[in-house]
Amino acid sequence: MTELNYISTLVIYYMKGRDYLIKEVIVVEGRDDITAVKRAVDAEIIATSGFGINAKTIERIKEAQKRKGVIILTDPDFAGEKIRSIISKRVKGVKHAYISQEDGLRAKDGNIGVENAKPEVILKALENAKITLEEKQEFFNMTDMYYFKLTGSSDSKARRQLLGKILGIGYGNANQMVSRLNNYGITKEEFIDAIEKIKKQLGE
C-alpha cells in the first residue's frame, strides 16, 4: 500500500482527489461535525456524542489507534477541550488537530464548532496534525455482506453488531461496515475468523 506523508498532503490531495484517504481515524464530537469533515476529506470518523462518550466509544478509539492511528478534532471550546483531555488520558499516542474559534464561528448565532468550519480550514488543521495519506483499498464489498448474511437476512443487524464487537470497529449498516472493514485494514483472515465466531454464537 502506497503511503504519502503529511509534508505534501494538500497538494497531493487536490491532485489525486479521492483516490487517497486519510490513514488515521478522525474523532469528532457529533454528526454535524462528521458531515463537515467529510466535505473536506475522505476518512473514517468516530463521533463521541459530546460528553456522552462511553466505554464502548473509548474501546473503539483504542482499536482505531492500534490499527490506523487517531486524530482528535473537537470543538474549540471548553467542552471540546474536556473531551480531548478525556480521550488523551485513556488512549495514548493520539494526534491532535485544532481549529481556531474564529474559524469555527457561525456568525448568525455565535455557535462555535467544527461543523461550521470551511473544508480548507479542516484540511489545514489535519495537515498540521501530520496526517498520512494512503491509497484506497477495497478488499471487501457488498457481495461479502450478502454472502455472509450481514445484509439481506432477518438477523443481519445482529450479525453486524457481533462483527463490530469482535473486530472493535463498532456497529454500522452494511455500507458503513464495508467502509470500516476496508479503511481499518481488516484482513480477510480476521474477517473469516470473526464470521466463524458469529456462527458459533448463533448456534450454526
Show the residue positions of the predicted features.
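Short hydrophobic beta-strand that contains or immediately precedes a catalytic carboxylate
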Residues: 27-29
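TOPRIM fold recognition
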Residues: 39, 43, 51, 56-204
